């Protein structure tokens, strides 16, 4: 089971474009500028509750990538089940030489819910998640 929850009264809930779409469109909850050759974190205004052994993969929208040169850095962005109750953000990267304007309500990425399995001998660091975006360190 998985659910998206609005964090604000004006949050746009993720939506699948068609009944056979795998991805839920994720919407910007703020205006932003993705600088030329730069990257920013854009908030979505939603959080995602996931059962253990599920995660949300945040991936680029093909139209933004092809037509505008805007992609998602660290693709797929992995939102683990223990990331809840934090707001889902999207790391947008501009591959062009021109700043790109994001308006609140723009579709900026897709979220695909996946199930995963672990190994029989599951080695887990003795840590509790305190936030996201690199909170478990690099070493």
Please describe what each predicted stretch is.
Residues 1-139:
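DUTPase catalytic domain/fold
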